[in-house]
């Protein structure tokens, strides 16, 4: 029956998330094998399939599904909807499979028009190098953007004892009024490749090597160069399982401009779970950072100083008036010194960091 042989000029435009072509051959009861677009992973066991299948956004049935899903989410009381990997949705023969312009932004606008009447705010999730300025495009169009630069910048600042790159990014957020949602660890990996154009490439490579040396993992790239990847590790293990570094990182996150979100495993100082990776088998690298915690695990973790102090930082960020809407944020950083200050009326909060000493202080009104 032959093979699908893509034109090399088309392949060069592709942005792959797994080895091989993003195509899954689905066998129908009549014996026909039909190719379906499949950007992300798949498992095939005879006639059984497990994975993520791309939707045809030109189909009215798909838009009916979007409408029903957004209505259901809104009925549950949701306020923010994350659009996971949305930039892979628009594609057409002869074009890229990722971030097509203007189709990507037209698609996002269509989703916005469905979500806004329901009181839903969209949070588009997109990984791209800093140098591509996609975060800026999202901001200019009025959307919040994930701060995928912060996790790597914080590790760089702590390990290399310098505030320069972190402070530069924080100032850009403030000066350009970019609305962000930030994190340290998350359900996926640490997105160091996103730092291209912000951090020197040799330094990015060194950070990847450092985290891997501390037990982190990178998926098997099968020798391909145009595959995006993250470094899979808990943030605590990426920092060498150092309580002081974890607390410093969390303090920086709480003062960083934007809305902080916290991955449960880092809050409880979770370590790389290599046993979970082993149980998951091939392509199970993400399980390193997804350990299931029992109630007793959590009760035991709450006794740890590193957990209690992180919770104190979260309470401060949630309750102190300096962090309320309308605050004026001032960032200064050079060499090993960093300061971030919030002023809101008579309330203020000031973080000062000495990366050389690996220490921080917080002053509150």
What are these regions (language model features)?
Residues 1-364:
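Active-site and adjacent substrate-binding regions of carbohydrate-active enzymes
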């Amino acid at each position: 029956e032959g093979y699908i042989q893509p034109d090399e000029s088309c392949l060069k435009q592709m942005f792959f998330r797994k080895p091989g072509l993003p195509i899954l051959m689905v066998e129908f009861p009549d014996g026909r094998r039909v190719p379906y677009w499949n950007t992300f992973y798949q498992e095939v066991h005879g006639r059984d399939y497990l994975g993520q299948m791309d939707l045809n956004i030109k189909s009215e049935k798909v838009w009916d599904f979007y409408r029903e899903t957004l209505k259901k989410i809104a009925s549950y009381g949701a306020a923010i909807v994350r659009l996971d990997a949305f930039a892979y949705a628009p594609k057409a023969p002869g074009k890229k499979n990722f971030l097509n312009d203007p189709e990507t932004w037209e698609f996002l606008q269509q989703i916005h028009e469905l979500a806004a009447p329901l009181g839903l705010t969209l949070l588009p999730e997109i990984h791209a190098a800093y140098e591509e300025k996609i975060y800026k495009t999202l901001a200019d169009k009025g959307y919040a953007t994930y701060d995928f630069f912060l996790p790597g910048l914080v590790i760089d600042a702590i390990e290399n004892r310098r505030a320069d790159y972190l402070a530069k990014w924080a100032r850009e957020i403030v000066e350009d009024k970019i609305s962000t949602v930030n994190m340290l660890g998350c359900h996926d990996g640490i997105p160091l490749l996103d730092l291209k154009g912000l951090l020197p490439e040799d330094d990015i490579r060194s950070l990847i090597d450092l985290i891997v040396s501390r037990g982190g993992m990178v998926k098997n790239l099968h020798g391909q160069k145009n595959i995006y990847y993250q470094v899979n590790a808990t943030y605590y293990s990426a920092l060498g399982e150092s309580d002081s570094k974890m607390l410093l990182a969390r303090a920086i996150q709480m003062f960083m401009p934007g809305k902080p979100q916290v991955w449960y495993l880092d809050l409880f100082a979770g370590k790389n779970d290599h046993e979970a990776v082993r149980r998951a088998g091939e392509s199970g690298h993400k399980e390193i950072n997804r350990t299931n915690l029992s109630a007793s695990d959590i009760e035991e973790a709450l006794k740890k100083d590193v957990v209690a102090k992180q919770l104190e930082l979260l309470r401060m960020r949630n309750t102190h008036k300096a962090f309320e809407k309308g605050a004026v944020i001032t960032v200064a950083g050079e060499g090993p010194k960093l300061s971030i200050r919030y002023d809101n009326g008579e309330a203020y909060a000031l973080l000062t960091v000495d990366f050389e000493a690996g220490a921080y202080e917080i002053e509150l009104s």
